[in-house]
UniProtKB/Swiss-Prot annotation:
CDD domains: QueC-like (cd01995). Catalyzes the ATP-dependent conversion of 7-carboxy-7-deazaguanine (CDG) to 7-cyano-7-deazaguanine (preQ(0)). It holds the Pfam family QueC. Pathway: Purine metabolism; 7-cyano-7-deazaguanine biosynthesis. Its EC number is 6.3.4.20. It catalyses: 7-carboxy-7-deazaguanine + NH4(+) + ATP = 7-cyano-7-deazaguanine + ADP + phosphate + H2O + H(+). Zn(2+) binds at residues 187, 196, 199, 202. This is 7-cyano-7-deazaguanine synthase. Belongs to the QueC family.
Length: 229
């Protein structure tokens, strides 16, 4: 029996990955992390989606220690979300070590479940300037987890080379565009669906959707070409 663990925030990207995984694996388990995030409404959204999509299991893990260590606009309500980069060239929504921690814990959870695959929705094409969304980082994490647990483990990144328009096309491929558009939470200000429309996450999501809806056939063809390679 094939099993996978999906790092599941309840946002557009992880929900799209989850829907795809349900078509590819016998058992799909979700893991969601509560790190005291600004947009923690996403946790309740993830719970609702996990129930509605009938996951084999859904674990919400308390990792609020990360909030104490990582100062970011996503971990401090007192820091406004900015569309400008900081002096170090990173967005102020970057949470240092977040994906290191998430993938480590997801790998441990997969080990306990007997799953050989961890799936995450990180993307280098539209990676918002986050260094822990890059392919080289994911490869390094996979190698470290395999060495550290002496177990074959694959970290799949279905969206790694897709732009946001192609990610919408992928959701549509599985007849889930409206579900992803209306029932997920990507907004840094915690607003479901199309969100606030002004934060970096909403702007990226909106541009991708507009591009996809303007020329579905071309974007679907582009997605198919990438999936074949």
């Amino acid at each position: 029996m094939s099993k996978a663990v999906v790092v599941f925030s309840g946002g557009q990207d992880s929900t799209t990955c989850l829907i795809q995984a349900l078509q590819q694996f016998d058992e799909v388990h979700g893991i969601t992390f509560d790190y005291g995030q600004r947009h923690r409404e996403e946790i309740e959204i993830a719970k609702e989606l996990a129930t509605n999509l009938k996951l084999a299991s859904h674990k919400v893990m308390d990792v609020t220690l990360l909030n104490e260590l990582a100062i970011s606009a996503l971990t401090r309500d007192s820091i406004p979300v900015s569309n400008e980069l900081m002096d170090n060239g990173l967005p102020n929504t970057f949470v240092p070590g977040r994906n290191i921690l998430f993938l480590t814990l997801a790998g441990i959870y997969a080990y306990q479940l007997g799953a050989d695959t961890v799936i995450t929705g990180v993307c280098e094409t539209d990676f918002s300037g986050y260094p822990d969304c890059r392919n080289d980082f994911v490869k390094a994490m996979q190698a470290a987890l395999e060495q550290g647990m002496d177990k074959k483990l694959t970290i799949q990144t279905p969206l790694m080379w897709l732009d946001k328009a192609e990610t919408w096309a992928l959701a549509d491929k599985f007849d889930s565009l409206e579900l992803v558009r209306n029932e997920t939470l990507t907004c840094y200000n915690g607003i479901k669906g199309d969100g606030c429309g002004t934060c970096p996450a909403c702007l990226l999501r909106k541009r991708g959707l507009e591009e996809y809806l303007a020329d579905k056939e071309a974007i679907q063809a582009r997605l198919s070409a990438k999936c074949e390679n």
